[in-house]
Amino acid sequence: MLAAAPPAGAAPGAMSKIAQSLLEKTLVEHPEAAHLVMHVTPPGRPDTDNEIIASNIGKIGKKADDDDLRILRTGHPETVVSKTGDRFNVSLPLFDSGRNTIGVVAIGLPYKPGDDKAALVRTAERIRDELRAQIPSAARFF
């Protein structure tokens, strides 16, 4: 699997090689995940500086939007069926191993009408929790 390159104009160092490697390893271990995106806030910076630092669908360096910030600030996950109807997108708070909130992880899972959405959320939470165990702190990514 190839690492996504930062887009033209992205901030220098926007893509974290460590985060990208962790993301790619996670996708290999979880083929049920169609996409995975990690939004992380650099240590000591305001949450409005939260940005995508690892992804298998591009957008590296993209700043958090209002939805991302809402999840980050409230700690409540959000879900949506994709416009094409074949993917269930789950966005969850992303924690480090000390359970400190460091950002948001978005996980896309295959979906068809009638699928158990609660089970898909549990799958996404399991993937997120496996990531958490491998992240000592957000500083590891910067």
Q: Where does each model-flagged region fall?
A:
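A short beta-strand signature within small-molecule sensing/ligand-binding domains used
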Residues: 85-93
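Short glycine-/small-residue motifs
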Residues: 103-104
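Extracytoplasmic/periplasmic sensor domains and loops in membrane signaling proteins
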Residues: 54-80, 122-126
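Flexible loop/coil segments at beta-strand boundaries within sensory signal-transduction domains
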Residues: 95-100
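Boundary at the C-terminal end of the N-terminal hydrophobic targeting segment
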Residues: 3-4, 8-10
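Short N-terminal helix-loop-first-beta-strand/juxtamembrane motif that initiates sensory/input modules
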Residues: 24-46, 141
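Juxtadomain coupling helices with adjacent low-complexity linkers
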Residues: 12-20, 24-25, 109-142
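Amphipathic coiled-coil signal-relay and dimerization helices
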Residues: 44-58
